Amino acid sequence: MTEKNQQEKMAAERQVELFTKAFEKAKENNGIWLANDGRKAPALYQKHLQVSAFNAIVLGMHAAQNGYKTNQYTLFSEAKKRGESVQSKEKGVPFLWYNWNEYVNKHNPEDKISRADYQALPSNRQADYKGIRSREVRALFNIEQTTLPMVDKTAYEATVQEHGRLSDRNDVECASTAIRQGVENLLDKARENMVEIRSDSTGVAHYDSKKDIIFLPKASSYEHYEDYARDAVSLLVTATGHGQRLAREGMIIKNGKASAEDSIKQERLITEVATAVKLQELGISAKLSPESMVMTDYWARELKENPCLIDILERDVNNAVDMLHKAERGEKVELNSKT
């Protein structure tokens, strides 16, 4: 992987710090490592920009660990434009921003052009070029870290009512109903476009990778609906790693042998994080499974000692959640014939 600059290294350290704190919190909180409490998914305040899955989990952990009412974030420059400022001694959270401002000829690496020049080319010429991705690290601040609550109390309170924790909102019943509808819609779309889902009478939720089938008990068999949702989302994420979908290393069985133990533990980390992202979109807190709880120290150590792991996590979590989004949009997720 490309060598990180100092800013990227500092961002990675901050991300690892947030994950480590979250895993430690899980030990004290019956496995809950991302207490979402009904907050809507992370977003940039007053901006209609898509937030990647990995950025979303980083922002979500930051909001949860600091007890913020919403997952609404802003740039320092944007706050300034609105007549606000970041409060003193507040520490931002890293947001990974990708640009494709330069393009290179697929047949001649010396031939590079700007984005504007690329867009001016006819479509048949554009096919000869591919984008060069560059990464920037931006610092974001939760709106509670700014002076918004004081400068424009009305706007702040309206934002909390629309995006905040259930305990801070007036429409609790409607919000709770929306959460259930979100889960059922996800399952319907996934069943229709990605993977077969069957009811399981044994009471044990599981994914059969050989048959590519999810077996899920009825919601009524769970004491808490949130646990049903967690099992459902976790199994959907697991299914994205199938050898004929994203083919994550920890999911692949070669010559009848399972992946190495480290790969299996890494797959478990990817599954838990991607599951948390999707649950966060639904407004549900993420809870580690008992099997995952025993891996938290290993994950924390590996994230700290292996600088490449945070990048692998970003890539695989983004890919898994993007695949679920594709199914939700009504696009078919076909199995790849090549394994």
Model-derived features with residue positions:
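N-terminal accessory/interface modules of nucleic-acid-binding and processing proteins
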Residues: M1-T339
